Amino acid sequence: MSSELNLKLLGTKTPYIFEYNKDLLEAFPNPNPNLDPLITLECKEFTSLCPITSQPDFGVVYIRYIPKDKMVESKSLKLYLFSYRNHGSFHESCINTILLDLVGLLEPKYLEVYGDFVSRGGIAIKPFVNYAIKEYQDFKEKRLLGAK
């Protein structure tokens, strides 16, 4: 079935890449494009490096989206998120890049990314960013107002 959907990673030996690589992301056709499910994906073991100190940063990344014609393949998403492991970038930049990469891949009706990072020096950073096509702008605004 993976070959029918043109998926390269699902069902194969996993090559773990720890340098940022958006080309790891894969999508498959949405089997129900007439429905509007809000899909939640959660990565509880997200890590990246502080671009100043090179110290590791840890957090949970939440991705919620309403698909249009394509859906993200979860193994490719896991490998993509793991590719941030040795990537030096601020939390906000990581979250923005994840959103842009997924929007570029999926062209969804709506997509949001929220990062809940472990505090450093007593400060917790929790960036939130969202995107919507024209017909979902009201939903986007309501979600933004309700962001944690």
UniProtKB/Swiss-Prot annotation:
Amino-acid positions noted as binding substrate in the UniProt annotation, renumbered to this chain: 72-74, 91-92
Keyword Chaperone attached: no
Active site, per annotation: 50 (thioimide intermediate), 57 (proton donor)
Molecular-function GO term, any one: preQ1 synthase activity
Transmembrane segments: none
One Pfam short name: QueF
GO cellular component, one term: cytoplasm
Keyword Cell membrane appears in the UniProt entry: no
Alphabetical UniProt keywords: Cytoplasm, NADP, Oxidoreductase, Queuosine biosynthesis
Associated pathway: tRNA modification; tRNA-queuosine biosynthesis
GO annotation terms (biological process): queuosine biosynthetic process; tRNA modification
EC number assigned by the record: 1.7.1.13
Domain of life assignment: Bacteria
InterPro entries linked to this entry: GTP-CH-I_C/QueF, NADPH_dep_7-cyano-7-deazaG_red, QueF, QueF_type1
Family listed: Belongs to the GTP cyclohydrolase I family. QueF type 1 subfamily.
HAMAP family (alphabetical): QueF_type1
Protein name per the record: NADPH-dependent 7-cyano-7-deazaguanine reductase
Gene name, Swiss-Prot/TrEMBL: queF
